[in-house]
């Protein structure tokens, strides 16, 4: 009799644990969904302000695919990218590898085999994707930093990262120039510059005017 009771209690404990795990998983999935949707909303608003309507509408849609969403939910923390947590556990992020090959606003997308060196090297990003990258980085800082966000947050993140060694030198120079403008002159002037100058193909200050 006591054996049956103990067995029932153990089974009850297992059911309770399973229920709690399922509840936690569902909650993380919901929180992850809200986070990536909030991020998309900020990017979309920024893109719309500079005239990149299609890019704003389609930004990061692959994050809702099973390959990215379920891994993102599993490693969701709320204060940083789930890709970082997945990378810490496994040594790499499957979600990120899926994502970077489908989204042109990431500089990692822009790599190809160089004929001279026979090595994969970075390629300078087209300007419309450079601008979307600016919106992406700004939005990520807004979402993850919350009240601690400042116009200089994206530049600070860039300066702390190893990206400077991986990004095409000209793309890095352009990105840093824009992020410094965002920090020093604010959104209104920076967005106007992106719309009226960068996306119009006008030269950056260090470039020569086309003859």
Language model segments and positions:
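Metal-dependent phosphohydrolase cores
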Residues: 6-211
């Amino acid at each position: 009799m006591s054996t049956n009771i103990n067995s029932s209690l153990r089974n009850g404990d297992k059911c309770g644990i399973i229920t709690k795990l399922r509840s936690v998983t569902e909650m993380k999935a919901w929180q992850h969904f809200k986070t990536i949707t909030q991020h998309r909303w900020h990017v979309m608003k920024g893109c719309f302000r500079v005239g990149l309507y299609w890019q704003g509408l389609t930004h990061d849609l692959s994050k809702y695919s099973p390959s990215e969403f379920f891994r993102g939910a599993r490693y969701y923390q709320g204060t940083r990218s789930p890709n970082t947590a997945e990378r810490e556990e496994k040594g790499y992020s499957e979600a990120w590898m899926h994502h970077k090959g489908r989204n042109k606003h990431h500089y990692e997308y822009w790599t190809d085999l160089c004929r001279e060196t026979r090595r994969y090297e970075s390629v300078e990003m087209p300007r419309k994707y450079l601008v979307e990258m600016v919106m992406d980085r700004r939005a990520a800082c807004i979402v993850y930093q919350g009240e601690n966000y400042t116009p200089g947050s994206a530049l600070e993140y860039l300066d702390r990262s190893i990206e400077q060694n991986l990004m095409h030198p000209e793309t890095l120079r352009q990105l840093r120039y824009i992020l410094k403008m965002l920090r020093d002159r604010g959104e209104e002037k920076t967005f106007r510059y992106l719309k009226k100058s960068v996306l119009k193909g006008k030269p950056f200050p260090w470039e020569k005017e086309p003859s």
